[in-house]
Amino acid sequence: MRVVVGSLNPTKIEGVRRAFNQFFDDVIVKGVEVNSGVGNQPFNNDVVKGAINRAINSFQDCDFSVGIEAGLFSLKKTLTGYIDFQVAAIYNGKRITIGFGPGFEYPPVVLSLIHI
């Protein structure tokens, strides 16, 4: 099985390799550079859009492609008003599935460095 990750980030590639190896044998995973179509620090729906774009744009000579994007989501009643979530999109050439990783809140001092 061939899997392409829409990123050259070694941590993302290794994470995808480990995940697919839990369910399939003989998995070959490679990363490619693609355009996410969103900013460097995506917000809200752009985080999901970036993951989907990465998955679709990296689908080439493979069984599955994976797009991973992280970014801030507005969430009321939190200290800063934002939670960072990671989004993964898996594409088989016909259908996309989406999953979210655990969210966390940046300390206010870190969030103050991000232009929201």
Spell out what each predicted region is.
Residues 114-116:
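Conserved small/polar residues in nucleotide/adenosyl-binding loops
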